[in-house]
Amino acid sequence: MVASISPYYGVSFLEFFLVFFSRLFSGKLFYDHLYIDDIQVIVFFAIAVSCSVVGTFLVLKKMAMYANVVSHTILFGLVCVCLFTHQLIHLSMQALTIAAVSTTLLTGASIHFIRNVFKVAEEASTALVFSLLFSASLLLLVFLTRNAHVGTELVIGNADALAKTDILPIFLVLLINLGISYCFFSSFVCVSFDTIFAFSLGIRIRLVDYLIMLLLSASIVGAFKAVGVLMSLAFLLIPGLIAKLIASSVQEMMVYSMVFGGLAALIAPALSRSILSIYGIGLSTSGLAVGLLLVFYVVMLVFVCSKRAIMLRQKLDK
């Protein structure tokens, strides 16, 4: 059954949530026709939670730079897959997975190879690999596709092109991330804080690093169509950075990360729809979500700094 008019048509910001939650609690989301707004909320929320799980460990391990490199260099693998499959937009999940995993492993191996063979600092080898692979991907994208629209979708995604079939893959990625993080939680935490102590306990540090790399690539694959390979970096890192400001334990940090990421995922589609309804302007849903995450970070940073300043002033007064 395909409805002619979306119940979200012409709604305001608050009305969007009234419509969505009424459809959710009435069960229509499970057996009725899913509209693009329903799909965007579901997919963005799953992406936010999935990326928040991995992002917590990336922030703790100070792998933000590596995540940045992978989110850019993975474009090289996607362009190569486009060339072999002759599919520029409708890539299969298998092709995306192969591209993401192979490029992630290639990036990590290249960084270690340059660092160990040429005896340069890890930051220098990371910057070199990033520059080479990302520039190569852009050159291939420009000279072989000559299609700016395709390039835009690869970079920032296209939330309006999401379909019902995109829900299952991202939930599979979410379950994989949650399952592996639960099984190896203590190892991830131990390696994140003290690699020497983790090694003394018999934890295989390299294996843990590769597991995190695989979770990272899986998260980027899940987020590719909705937010692109570059916007996914914000979903991976910003919620974790926000949570780190206020959390007192790793568990709290992961929960707060999911909360802030989930809030951005819920608000962005509603904000995009309301702006379209009121002003007739279509804005990128993924761009709005990233903008909201940045606003959350600035607000929490100001709040934490103000709280610390007040506490310091109270101590000085005593």
From Swiss-Prot:
Listed transmembrane segments: 1-21, 39-59, 64-84, 94-114, 124-144, 170-190, 196-216, 226-246, 252-272, 285-305
Gene Ontology CC, one term: ATP-binding cassette (ABC) transporter complex
Pfam family, one: ABC-3
Protein location: Cell inner membrane
Keywords assigned by UniProt, alphabetized: Cell inner membrane, Cell membrane, Membrane, Transmembrane, Transmembrane helix, Transport
GO-annotated biological processes: response to zinc ion; transmembrane transport
Major location category of this protein: membrane
InterPro entries recorded: ABC_BtuC-like, ABC_TroCD
Topology with respect to the bilayer: Multi-pass membrane protein
Similarity-based family: Belongs to the ABC-3 integral membrane protein family.
PANTHER family, A to Z: ABC-TRANSPORTER METAL-BINDING PROTEIN, METAL TRANSPORT SYSTEM MEMBRANE PROTEIN CT_070-RELATED
Function as written in the Swiss-Prot or TrEMBL entry: Part of an ATP-driven transport system CT_067/CT_068/CT_069/CT_070 for a metal.
Protein name: Probable metal transport system membrane protein CT_070
Species in which this protein is naturally found: Chlamydia trachomatis serovar D (strain ATCC VR-885 / DSM 19411 / UW-3/Cx)
